[in-house]
Amino acid sequence: MPIKVKIKNDGEFISEKPVQIREIIRSDEVIAAVFNGKLIDLRSTIDSDGEVEFVDLFHELAPEVYRHTMSHILAQAVMNVYGKKNVRLGIGPAIENGFYYDFEILNGKITEEDLSRIEEEMKKIIEQNIPVERIEMSKDDAISFMTEKDQPYKVELLKEIQDNKVTLFKQGDFVDLCRGPHMPSTGMVKHFKLLSVSGAYWKGDEKNPMLQRVYGTAFLRQEELKNYLDLLEEARKRDHRKLGPALDIFFIDFDVAAGMPVFTPNGTVILKELMEFSRQLHIEYGYEEVMTPLVMSEKLWRMSGHWEHYKENMYFTTKEEQQFAIKPMNCPGHILVYKNKPVSYRDLPVRFFEFGKVHRYERSGVLHGLFRVRSFTQDDAHIFCRIDQVENEIAGVINLVHRIYSQFGFDYSAELSTMPEDHMGDEATWEKATEALRKAMESVGLQYVVKEKEGAFYGPKIDFHVRDSIGRTWQCATIQLDFLMPQRFGLVYTSMDGKYQQPVMIHRAIYGSLERFLGILIEHYAGAFPTWLAPVQVIIIPIADRHFEYAEKVKSEFVKNGVRVKIDARRETVGYKIRDAQSMKIPYMLVVGDREADSEAVSVRTRGSDFGSKPVKLVLEKITEEIATRSLKNLMEE
């Protein structure tokens, strides 16, 4: 039977025998192909009917191929630098904006200082323009080959492969186990930079050997690489793991409570402001605040399914021969509140929200400042409603998301994830629920991308991604429909005809984790919070000791009006105090001396401007208005 291959936007190819992709390409610029939805190498063989799309350097998948090849060049360079017999290879995939490779260096290690030497070796490999070859062989032969090369990690990977045929890629004397695809030659990749080296357990398991992971970035054009490196430098300056402790917002004591941040008075002020802002809006939108236990019995977690599916991420304690778990999620607690009294169709929708502290075990190797922790607070809410109410409820949540994100100056985007292959519930209910999500987003004019078959097994969902001030995106809010929990817990409401019906449950969080959201805000604002969020909103700087009394008088007026204010009474120069206040990102610095005391005024400075002498009354009015309206702008500049 002839093989028929439809070429996207370019007719059809018919062959009487299996054919390699490179035999049917019609341009020298093609680097890979997509066959029946799968990214493949040009040297791959087609032996069945299907549709092929060619990937050139302008295709959206080109960076993945480019970066994957760069990871092999990195591995080859490391073997050249440290000696082939001293290097054991782990894995080396392409990742977003870059690539990495894991190594075990026998009798040595890779240091940050070594990266420049490795880069130079990579450039030599690129200059040689070595052809990249694809090799097919049996799994047994590949195991023998890698055993002979003393590559135990590759042997382990090979033994896990189900197919009897595997692929390897060769460039010069370097050979690696890999599915591909790769660029046709090493000379086709040029613009790269090695970024860092860190530890990484083999397969991410702490029981396995610790390898060394070298990270790099690569782009098709030099300008893109430069822009990305500039972004990384700006992100480094904004890193919340440095700014947070420097601004006395939080710290983490890894000897006492790894992954569990400790918030100072400054950090606590910010978190309380975030919660109060959210609380006010939730009440406005018809939510009722609840508080549920931190520790609940094994029985509850078995019923919810967490015991079966989430046990490895939970913390436990046993008392009086009964096992308890510290809650990793708030939903079972909210279900208890719902079940506490009978619910009629007239009562629906019911909306509960809670600033619930949860604990989830994370491996120490993945902990990352406030972004990946073991203890955090969720702005968690659950809505119980009828299926015909879903659209309106989702629209209400989207509006609430908009109100909250706009307050911080965030743009955002949305994704709709639909029914996966493995799902519970009938398809008709899924379709109705998914359509309700679509209509809700469209009714409020929210643009979205559809992620086919990426919903949870218990319901479709909407994810929101915020974009920060330097263009990075962060997944924060989630709206999740759930058909499973109401069924597991036997949730019901009395319908109009007096019969019991099962409600739909909507899980949603907007900040997501308050701690993570705070980390995002620190980096978004580079620590310079808008006045309403700033831990210290005003600092008063007396020029000399004789001005302390007037400084206290000014402070008293601000405190009475709800402003967070301090006096810098240190025996330092005014210039030093101003520089220190600016380094601590305090929004307003009010300098007071003889002239100000005589005229009931203050000399006003902000983080970037000097407004000179202004009446205390005017300054107080501007600052209190700025705080009350939660303005992102400095109102003194208006």
UniProtKB/Swiss-Prot annotation:
Its EC number is 6.1.1.3. GO terms for molecular function: ATP binding; metal ion binding; threonine-tRNA ligase activity; tRNA binding. GO terms for cellular component: cytoplasm. GO terms for biological process: threonyl-tRNA aminoacylation. Gene3D superfamilies: 3.30.54.20, Anticodon-binding domain (3.40.50.800), Bira Bifunctional Protein, Domain 2 (3.30.930.10), Threonyl-trna Synthetase, Chain A, domain 2 (3.30.980.10). Zn(2+) binds at C331, H382, H507. SMART domains: tRNA_SAD (SM00863). Residues 1-56 form the TGS domain. The keyword Coiled coil does not apply. Keywords: Aminoacyl-tRNA synthetase, ATP-binding, Cytoplasm, Ligase, Metal-binding, Nucleotide-binding, Protein biosynthesis, RNA-binding, tRNA-binding, Zinc. Binds 1 zinc ion per subunit. It is an enzyme of class 6 (ligase). Coiled coil: none annotated. Its cofactor is Zn(2+). It is found in: Cytoplasm. CDD domains: TGS_ThrRS, ThrRS_anticodon, ThrRS_core. Residues 239-530 are annotated as: Catalytic. It comes from the Bacteria. It holds the Pfam family tRNA_SAD. PANTHER family: THREONINE--TRNA LIGASE, CHLOROPLASTIC_MITOCHONDRIAL 2, THREONINE-TRNA LIGASE. Catalyzes the attachment of threonine to tRNA(Thr) in a two-step reaction: L-threonine is first activated by ATP to form Thr-AMP and then transferred to the acceptor end of tRNA(Thr). Also edits incorrectly charged L-seryl-tRNA(Thr). Homodimer. This is Threonine--tRNA ligase.
